[in-house]
Amino acid sequence: MLRKLANQSLSVAGKWQQQQLRRLNIHEYQGAELMSKYGINVPKGVAVASLDEVKKAIQDVFPNQSEVVVKSQVLAGGRGLGTFKNGFQGGVHIVKADQAEDIASKMLGQILVTKQTGAQGKVVSKVYLCEKMSLVNEMYFSIILDRATAGPLIIACRKGGTSIEDLAEKFPDMIIKVPIDVFKGISDADAAKVVDGLAPKVADRNDSIEQVKKLYKLFCETDCTMLEINPLAETSDNKLVAADAKLNFDDNAAYRQKEIFSLRDSSQEDPREVAAAKADLNYIGLDGEIGCMVNGAGLAMATMDIIKLHGGTPANFLDVGGNATEGQVVEAFKILTADEKVKAILVNIFGGIMKCDVIASGIVNAAKQVQLKVPVIVRLEGTNVEQGKRILKESGMKLITAEDLDDAAEKAVKALA
């Protein structure tokens, strides 16, 4: 939704961009610690992984607090309205300090299901204990990379505390968008435009401008792709506070952001996506039944569209790229066959840099290592296509061949029957 609000184009003319495999997403407590290092106001809090740690934190960190906020830590939104598989309702609770241990016991080690986790949910390994702040106003603030303006874009709204989708629908006139010149950086005028648009009720204007500038500094210096604060709150002591934040980082910057990338929690990520990343494959899991292996992101998207056109649903986006090795093809098949939802696999290769014979050899080797229990539909075209077809034919494998993409998609859908 942020991308739609930014009204960004699909590409930046004349600029080559390395394909981004994944974006690092960190937990709320990690984001709060990072923002605090940049002088950004955040609630006092501590992450704990056991009931003993909860008890100690209440005694040491919140000795004079009558109430605290207990937040389950999963890499997904919608925690407050989520449901644990043990029946406990809500992943965020404001409780009496002496009740924190009991509430945490219902969260730690349990699976939380939200609108963003899917039915499988995510395991809560830590909870974040925060001070309960006295808020007088809630707003929305984010910074994203906007391809339309070829730079960072600040999106803000006077209303906050709910999803940006709802805010944009209910309060379109309150949405503020301020593009920032990536070469000049954020100016006092830029930050003032954001603050004046938000029209804080009690927070000091000059202090608020400095907070916006610090948020922008963090965004740039840590190679963020998205920084979202919802709510950006005003407190009764006239401060602007990042009450809840999400930060994503560009994987291409991992080599120079080693400290941040050491925060990656692979246990919260799709294991198939983790395996794909290790093999330098671009994979995104979906909910369909037809596994896809394609070279090139554009062709992969087109393949998924054609599958939908013929009444099927893709199980994934999987781009093996233009220089895939046999080993990567084998790994791709392992990832596809590990998905129990997959009832058929469609391989769609247009060989340019990628050679069809390499793909064919990879398919044959994969069949030897992985028990293929589902139909495999193969469409090959381009470089070394005849050699590739010969390798498949001589392998003795029971493959379904297709002449073109439309034919391949139609056969994949029929194979489900």
Curated annotation (Swiss-Prot):
It catalyses: succinate + ATP + CoA = succinyl-CoA + ADP + phosphate. PROSITE patterns: ATP_GRASP (PS50975), SUCCINYL_COA_LIG_3 (PS01217). It is found in: Mitochondrion. GO terms for molecular function: ATP binding; magnesium ion binding; succinate-CoA ligase (ADP-forming) activity. Residues 1-24 form a transit peptide. The keyword Zinc does not apply. Substrate binds at residues 295, 352-354. Expressed in roots, stems, flowers, leaves and fruits. Pathway: Carbohydrate metabolism; tricarboxylic acid cycle; succinate from succinyl-CoA (ligase route): step 1/1. Keywords: ATP-binding, Ligase, Magnesium, Metal-binding, Mitochondrion, Nucleotide-binding, Transit peptide, Tricarboxylic acid cycle. One of its GO terms (biological process) is tricarboxylic acid cycle. GO terms for cellular component: mitochondrion; succinate-CoA ligase complex. Binds 1 Mg(2+) ion per subunit. ATP binds at residues 71, 78-80, 138. Residues 32-275 form the ATP-grasp domain. Its EC number is 6.2.1.5. Heterodimer of an alpha and a beta subunit. Belongs to the succinate/malate CoA ligase beta subunit family. Succinyl-CoA synthetase functions in the citric acid cycle (TCA), coupling the hydrolysis of succinyl-CoA to the synthesis of ATP and thus represents the only step of substrate-level phosphorylation in the TCA. The beta subunit provides nucleotide specificity of the enzyme and binds the substrate succinate, while the binding sites for coenzyme A and phosphate are found in the alpha subunit. This is Succinate--CoA ligase [ADP-forming] subunit beta, mitochondrial.
